[in-house]
Design a protein with these regions (language model features):
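N-terminal Rossmann-fold NAD(P) dinucleotide-binding loop
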Residues: 213-214
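Glycine-rich helix-loop-beta junction characteristic of Rossmann-like nucleotide cofactor-binding loops
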Residues: 194-199, 222, 287-288, 310-311
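C-terminal hydrophobic helical "lid"/dimerization subdomain
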Residues: 3, 9-11, 16-17, 283-284, ...
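Adenosine-nucleotide cofactor-binding segment
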Residues: 203-209, 221-303
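Glycine-rich phosphate-binding loop and adjacent beta-alpha segment
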Residues: 243, 263, 299-359, 397-401
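NAD(P)H dinucleotide-binding glycine-rich loop of Rossmann-like/cofactor-binding domains
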Residues: 76, 87, 114-207
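Glycine-rich beta-strand-centered segment in the early N-terminal region that forms part
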Residues: 40-57, 72-126, 172-174
Length: 401
């Protein structure tokens, strides 16, 4: 089968770490740790497993992190290389899978938890929290936190992948492929809304208006009784979509603190500049005394994390949805913030996400579709999606055009 593969190469990984975040365009050239290959179809010869033919497969920020080398080394033991990426997938069963007949359109919960690995349920899985399974490196599969990061299962960036019944959700007949491919990221937004624990009428800040941030706004409006939702958006179309999805206020990154002050009447504090490295003056940056009740980082960058930590009221809640970067945690200590992570989804989040995908204003959210052999263009587009007015870029695995 034809597939895109991320492989281990120390020189290319070093290059990715050195330039990936600053010049991501270089990483779709010869230095990319990605290659288009012909490889055997993945097969797991265990009960409950079946092959899926991907139709559309999204390009996620975590996929781009793997390509650019910006992913934390924390995850290095939780993947197995080489692997075929792609965990945002709508596909078609090519064989029966227990109660699901061949030809059923499905979306995939990518987490490779105890049921998929053939081991006794760990405490999180017993509690229904499969997204934080303790057994993602054991069982009959190679290590891999998700489909799309495990060498044994394949991923959506290939012509076949293999999936366990516990991961499969049938797609209703009336739901288009373009909406169905958004179900996995929407399920993450459902998980986020629940982890945020937003009290009725509470003020919320969402830093970032890519797919993660926009879907967070949508889920917060649908599933909570949040009051004002302020979104930090870099680009015009992001701002328009944020309002369409339920934001009450939208601000540019350099206006974030001012926007929060305006809506919460917080007090602005600007620390003095002090001597820093090489004798240069450095400032800790402004902060607020007061602020929003709940702040959500949907980017994972240092600047975004600083924004949410410095604009949340004392005792407020900060939710980390983007893959975190290094940051000064002094505000979390000093303001007694509750800091919560949110990762993937669990419970009935996929069923809720299927309903959202059918009802929400998601037309044209998928703004770029590419065949596998045009992967360089696809990744370049995904790197620049916000600037280009695109929310989600996908591989159309059926296409050879």
């Amino acid at each position: 089968m034809l597939a895109l593969e991320i492989f281990r190469s120390i020189p290319r990984y070093a290059a990715a770490r050195a330039v990936g975040s600053r010049m991501p365009g270089l990483l779709v050239g010869p230095m990319a740790p990605v290659r288009l290959v012909t490889r055997d179809e993945p097969v797991v010869r265990r009960p409950g497993w079946a092959q899926v033919r991907p139709l559309l497969s999204g390009i996620c920020g975590s996929d781009l992190g793997a390509v650019t080398g910006s992913t934390s080394l924390y995850f290095s033991a939780l993947v197995s290389m080489p692997f075929v990426p792609g965990h945002e997938v709508v596909g078609e069963l090519v064989e029966d899978c227990e109660d699901l007949p061949r030809g059923t359109r499905v979306v995939i919960d990518p987490v490779l938890a105890c049921a998929a690995r053939g081991v006794a349920p760990c405490p999180p899985c017993q509690a229904g929290r499969t997204n934080v399974c303790n057994h993602i490196t054991v069982g009959h599969l190679a290590p891999g936190l998700q489909t799309g990061f495990c060498q044994d299962t394949g991923g959506g960036w290939g012509e076949r992948l293999t999936v366990h019944r516990s991961q499969l959700h049938a797609v209703p007949d009336g739901l288009s492929d373009e909406r169905a491919v958004l179900v996995e990221p929407l399920s993450c937004a459902v998980q986020l809304a629940r982890r945020a624990q937003v009290p009725p009428g509470a003020s919320v800040l969402v830093s970032g208006a890519g797919a993660v941030g926009l879907f967070a706004v949508l889920a917060l409006r649908e599933l909570t009784e949040a009051g004002r939702i302020t979104v930090i958006a870099k680009h015009g179309r992001q701002a328009d979509l944020a309002r369409a999805f339920g934001a009450t206020d939208v601000a540019a990154p350099d206006e974030a603190m001012r926007a929060v002050r305006r809506t919460t009447r917080a007090l602005r504090v600007v620390p003095p500049s002090l001597p820093g490295p090489a004798g240069r003056l450095a400032s800790a940056g402004e902060m607020l005394l007061g602020g929003v009740d709940v702040a959500i980082d949907a980017v994972g960058s240092t600047s975004s994390l600083e924004t949410v930590l410095r604009s949340t009221r004392a005792g407020g809640r900060v939710v980390l949805s983007g893959m975190p970067a290094p940051v000064d945690l002094s505000p979390a200590w000093f303001r007694e913030l509750e800091v919560a992570g949110t990762y993937a989804s669990s419970g009935d989040a996929f069923e809720v996400a299927l309903d959202l995908a059918a009802q929400a204003p998601l037309d044209d959210v998928v703004g770029g579709r590419y065949p596998l052999h045009r992967w360089r263009e696809a990744l370049d587009h995904a790197h620049s999606a916000g600037r280009l007015g695109t929310v989600k870029v996908c591989f159309d695995v059926r296409s050879r055009a």
